[in-house]
């Protein structure tokens, strides 16, 4: 069965639709509990910041993954391959004397991702022209990567939480389905672009999903933004400080690439307030016997 980023769990049919009758006690429970298992190790972000060699390796590998996966014309396949790459590099030391290994790792990540996305795919389908890697070398490296990832190939990513977060919104539009589609589309495009930025490696997938969705919602329907923010913050698995920090990181990135600074500053002020217009919203409580440890975030001041 073809793997979809939005439905990482085996029982994907459970995630196809979210509505007012969704059992929030059980549906997202497992996703929030296991998401940290599909992240790079906790030291990876700081290692990349402090080591030009490691950062260069990651950039080169992502460039190779983009090249190798181009023939498939599938952004989700590329995203999944980079997820495998980051998780692998965070657990293994790269030999500096063998730069060709980086290409083999990149190609193997694409191969694994392609097999998840396209079950009928074989190694012979990979674009290996001009490379000296044969099928046996690729399969051996695949096994090394699988071991490092503990065979957790159904990655929990920000896309896994989009439908859940959107379902929390009370859309006040003539065509709520169209707005949902627009929110999902714009948030997805933003999430794809964030993956290359190491600043977002320290945030949990659910936090990235919530922050990216809020960023998209402010652009698409700013008048409803306060209520949208309140609804996401009421989910007890969402840490408000982490959400705020990730949201600000997206804004900083947006400003750097030339977007309007004034509108994003307005969104920061709105997000950091309590919204009286949404006081009637009921708290969405998700309980669990144990909760994953809060991921340490940057202490930057804004």
Curated annotation (Swiss-Prot):
Q: Does the keyword Nucleotide-binding apply?
A: no
* Keywords in alphabetical order: Cell cycle, Cell division, Cyclin
Could you confirm whether the keyword DNA-binding appears in this record?
A: no
According to its UniProt entry, the protein's GO biological process terms are: cell division
- CDD domains from the entry? CYCLIN_AtCycD-like_rpt1 (cd20543), CYCLIN_AtCycD-like_rpt2 (cd20544)
Note the InterPro entries from the entry: Cyclin, Cyclin-like_dom, Cyclin-like_sf, Cyclin_C-dom, Cyclin_N
Q: Which family does it belong to?
A: Belongs to the cyclin family. Cyclin D subfamily.
Its name, as the record gives it, is Putative cyclin-D6-1
The record lists the lineage as:
Eukaryota, Viridiplantae, Streptophyta, Embryophyta, Tracheophyta
Q: Which gene encodes it?
A: CYCD6-1
């Amino acid at each position: 069965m073809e793997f979809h980023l939005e439905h990482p769990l085996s029982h994907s049919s459970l995630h196809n639709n979210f509505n007012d009758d969704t059992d929030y006690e059980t549906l997202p429970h497992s996703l929030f509990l296991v998401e940290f298992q599909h992240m790079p190790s906790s030291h990876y972000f700081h290692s990349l910041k402090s080591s030009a060699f490691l950062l260069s390796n990651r950039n080169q590998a992502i460039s190779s993954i983009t090249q190798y996966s181009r023939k498939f014309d599938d952004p989700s396949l590329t995203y999944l391959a980079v997820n495998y790459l980051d998780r692998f590099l965070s657990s293994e030391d790269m030999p500096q004397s063998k730069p060709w290994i980086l290409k083999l790792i990149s190609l193997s990540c694409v191969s694994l991702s392609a097999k998840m996305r396209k079950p009928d795919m074989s190694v012979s389908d990979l674009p290996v022209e001009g490379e000296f890697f044969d099928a046996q070398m690729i399969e051996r490296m695949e096994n090394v990567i699988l071991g490092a990832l503990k065979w957790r190939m159904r990655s929990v990513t920000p896309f896994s939480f989009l439908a859940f977060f959107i379902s929390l919104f009370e859309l006040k539009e003539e065509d709520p389905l169209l707005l949902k589609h627009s929110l999902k589309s714009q948030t997805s495009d933003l999430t794809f672009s964030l993956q290359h930025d190491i600043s977002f490696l320290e945030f949990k997938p659910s936090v990235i999903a919530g922050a990216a969705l809020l960023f998209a919602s402010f652009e698409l329907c700013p008048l409803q933004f306060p209520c949208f923010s309140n609804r996401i913050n009421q989910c007890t698995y969402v840490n408000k400080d982490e959400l705020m920090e990730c949201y600000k990181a997206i804004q900083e990135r947006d400003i750097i690439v030339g977007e309007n600074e004034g509108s994003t500053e307005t969104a920061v002020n709105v997000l950091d307030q309590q919204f009286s217009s949404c006081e009637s919203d009921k708290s969405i409580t998700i309980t669990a016997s144990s909760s994953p440890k809060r991921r340490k975030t940057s202490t930057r001041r804004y």
